[in-house]
């Protein structure tokens, strides 16, 4: 069965890895999609690179699937400015891709939780490199993949799931929740999590995503190009903003007294305004306005994984692409056309 799209099956790990191990032993290169300057997807190219050697505490993973996050698009373009942290003029890392799923191929000294042949997944935000046949990841970033999920499904959860879980934890039964950017990966998880807690959920995204947001549970939907979600007839108890672009005062007026606004991504100006004056405006008006400081690691995405395994939360894969098709995959996410998550796998 296809390792990207098929369900996990019982298989002898050495057999699964035989060809790659031979390749590693010979010292041949492996495929990776790399870039050396910020820009459009056109700057990406496939290159043969040396097989990475795991350092102490690291794991080498044979990649089966890597999902695309908006952070990959931002790191490709070097915009917003915070995407250049660690690499002001040139990319800090040549290969993008943090949400990986695959098979342990080798381990560095000190690794105790995994061994070759284990199926793993996680958010490798520190090292990235998931858009390749092999990548390195810290042991602490990975968890064992549930047998009930395919590699593709598992790769969709770590970053998007952690954001959605932490961004909706204040939702309660009967509360009014708004999610801006609700038609993407984090947003589609967030809608389902808030609905599971009994909230009335409004999803905001472009016109092409209205039906999709309803299909994952949104009670109301807003096309941001037609309507201003910060001037509701009934204000919200919780707002999760995945693409912040408005003023702090606009967010304040959309909240009930005692309400909460948290943003994760968006324009630099909007984020700086929230950081600089959000807490002050919030205190003066009886609201909580701030940036969501997302906690990383398996402990913070495992709750969503558990719900996906039981079927309480559904995973929505919009499309799958090969490594060679990565430019198209990134453009689909970056241009706001993906419904849920986009996944990239080996050729």
List where the protein language model places each region.
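N-terminal glycine-rich beta->alpha transition that marks the start or flank
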Residues: 40, 49-101
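C-terminal hydrophobic helical "lid"/dimerization subdomain
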Residues: 21-28, 297-347
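A structural motif shared across PLP-dependent enzymes of the aminotransferase-like
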Residues: 126-139
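Glycine-rich phosphate-binding loop and adjacent beta-alpha segment
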Residues: 245-313, 346-347
